[in-house]
Amino acid sequence: CAERFAQTEGLNTELSYWHWPDEVRPAAAGVLQQFGSDLQALAMSRDGTAVPLEWREGVVAGDTAQYIFTSGTTGLPKAAVISHARWLMAGDSMQLLWEITRDDCFYCFLPLYHGAASMSLTATAMAAGARIVVRRKFSRSEFWRDIRAHGITFCQYVGEICRFLLSAPATDSDREHSLRKMAGTGLTPEIWQQWISRFGAVFQIYEGWGGTESNTNTINLDNRIGSCGRVPFWEKTNLRLVRYDQEKGDYIRDENGFLQLAGVNEPGEAIGMVIQYPGVVAGRFEGYTSEEASEKKLLRNVFEQGDVWWTSGDLLRCDEDGYCWFVDRIGDTFRWKSENVSTMEVGDALGDFKGLDAITVYGVQVAGHGGRAGMAALVMHEGAGFDPRAFWELAISRLPRYAAPLFVRLMDTPDMTGNYKLRKVDLQKQGYDSAQTGDPLFVRNDKLQTYVPLTAATLEEALRG
């Protein structure tokens, strides 16, 4: 990929990524100035010939190529630094792992400011010389039409995309398409199974784990439903899972103060050893534009004095065969009635509720009560009504009563992140205050075996129960 980008007369294509040491970088002010004008007008004015060499004079692989904002699902977005080397490496590695050729056609419906679109998808297509079909915004009604019209073979999913598509009415042509490969994160085992049952078992689904700024990741290469990848040789990677006490909100350390590795099937936080070595791209942590935000993601003296590790904030578990499974985000587990509740487990259990487009689960504070009560924000499919009794029956049949959401919020115009997830941090702040939400609110009533509209009286009755 790097060589293809360098097909300009007079440019040495044999250079390594790190032609200059990190501390000796020529100024790239001239390059930045060139792109300070209207980028679209600049692109449309090109006639297909190579751009002038002086535009790239002084640019090295370690320089910043772009800033990608994190999704902001659980907090304010942060601008992650993406170097040219990281972007190129993403394309080269994914092309090999996904076995992409120039005959493939990618479908990009994600915003190009999102890491999945601007890095792994776009960089991979360019590395292989494959085509990309870009849609300005995801459309459930146009998705399969686009797939068939353009002969698309590969698309990337995030968030609730697969659930959105499954909620559309089934048709006789559901299996008549060219799509063969999909990659992304957040595909639950239930949705995964429903997807291949409805749209065909021809799919190679590359479920993975990682993040825009992460310096390590996993990817499922053999269709193990629900797994986000397999690590056969941990000692050959910079990834580790370390023990974490969710109740205390802290790491579990040994007698010397160092962290401990999680055992088989024991949830542990995923961390990546930071490798800042000239000539090595993998393992780098390029951080954010804010040094303070970057430092908060680093953990020092983890297994020995002086080592530095990037912290993900994600809990994973690894089974006896080396397969990794996403457990939860640290902080997404709340405590209610002296029990720990995983927001992900609750969301997965209720995710196939009839007519549901999207669900997010979170804990909200209740005056006079310790811990946080569960609340589910629901987005229903257009034209689908909310059946409170059916939702109560589903929740009680699949979850312990302490984990079944106490509150339900129905949202007509949800505030979604760029990767199609409900913005949880704002939902938590609003809680069950009708003055702030402006949405229909329900509270669980076990005596009536249903969810009833939230009032002061119905809330008091629910809390007594």
Q: Language-model features: where?
A:
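AMP-binding/adenylate-forming catalytic core of the ANL superfamily
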Residues: 1, 155, 272, 276-403, ...
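Structural core segment of the AMP-binding/adenylate-forming
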Residues: 1-44, 54, 170
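Conserved pre-ATP/AMP-binding loop-to-beta segment of ANL
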Residues: 20, 36, 44-69, 76, ...
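AMP-binding/adenylate-forming catalytic domain of the ANL superfamily
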Residues: 20, 399-422, 439-463
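Gly/Ser/Thr-rich phosphate-binding loop
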Residues: 41-43, 127, 144, 149-157, ...
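Conserved S/T- and glycine-rich ATP-binding loop of Class I adenylate-forming
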Residues: 64, 70-73, 106, 112, ...
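Conserved AMP-binding/adenylation subdomain of ANL enzymes
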Residues: 88-105, 113-153, 168
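Conserved beta-loop-beta connector loops within the AMP-binding
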Residues: 240-275, 279-284, 384-388
